[in-house]
């Protein structure tokens, strides 16, 4: 799953993954991303992915337990992709994309995240532009989200339910 957390000023929380991460260390990514576990109903489709997202937002972003509930997350869509992290690891998943607009205090887990920041659309575009020329690396799934869904999400932050679809968008293998 991928969570896009926007504050009340419509800025998106992004994170730079910790250097110690096994897959995609040090890359910039969306607010929170991970995978459901085979526990407590997390394997059960959209609702299971929402439960996993809430668990990871508490664990990874340090959001106070119970502050965000699974029904606060707006399901947007799903995308299927493959992305090689290195010679050993590859992501191959159906990524459930969720969005939420809320002001929350965060206390990032340094084992998971080295930096966070809130960005507006222009600032995010500048970061992506730097990724093409500088030493800035962007998560491949985050690039897919930005290129295919994020503008529509940003335009509809006040009516997120109006843009959800039940498709699985086939993205293929990405670099």
PLM regions: where:
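A generic structural motif
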Residues: 7-9, 125
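Conserved Nudix-box catalytic region and its N-terminal flanking loop in Nudix hydrolases
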Residues: 1-4, 11-63
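Nudix hydrolase/Nudix homology domain
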Residues: 32, 75-175
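Short, well-ordered strand-loop elements centered on a beta-strand within folded domains, enriched
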Residues: 10-16, 105-110
């Amino acid at each position: 799953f991928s969570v896009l957390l926007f504050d009340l000023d419509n800025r998106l929380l992004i994170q730079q993954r910790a250097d110690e991460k096994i897959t995609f260390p040090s890359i910039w990514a969306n607010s929170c991303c991970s995978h459901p576990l085979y526990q407590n109903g997390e394997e059960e489709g959209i609702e299971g992915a929402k439960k996993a997202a809430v668990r990871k937002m508490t664990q990874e972003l340090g959001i106070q337990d119970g502050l965000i509930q699974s029904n606060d997350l707006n399901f947007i869509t799903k995308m299927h992709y493959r992305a090689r992290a290195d010679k050993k690891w590859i992501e191959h998943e159906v990524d459930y994309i969720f969005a939420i607009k809320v002001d929350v205090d965060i206390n990032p887990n340094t084992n998971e995240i080295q930096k966070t920041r809130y960005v507006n659309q222009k600032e995010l575009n500048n970061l992506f532009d730097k990724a093409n020329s500088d030493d800035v690396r962007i998560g491949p799934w985050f690039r897919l989200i930005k290129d295919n869904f994020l503008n529509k999400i940003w335009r509809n932050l006040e009516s997120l339910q109006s843009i959800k679809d039940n498709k699985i968008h086939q993205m293929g293998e990405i670099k």
